[in-house]
Amino acid sequence: PAGHGARARTRDLFAR
């Protein structure tokens, strides 16, 4: 869900 370590997770989604 949004707001759950979004910053750390964003790197996983944009790991490119």
UniProtKB/Swiss-Prot annotation:
Which gene underlies this protein? Answer: RPL21
Give the protein's recorded name: Large ribosomal subunit protein eL21
Swiss-Prot/TrEMBL keywords: Ribonucleoprotein, Ribosomal protein
Q: Which domain of life is it from?
A: Eukaryota
- State the organism named in the record: Spinacia oleracea (Spinach)
* Gene Ontology CC, one term: ribosome
Which family does the similarity line name? Belongs to the eukaryotic ribosomal protein eL21 family.
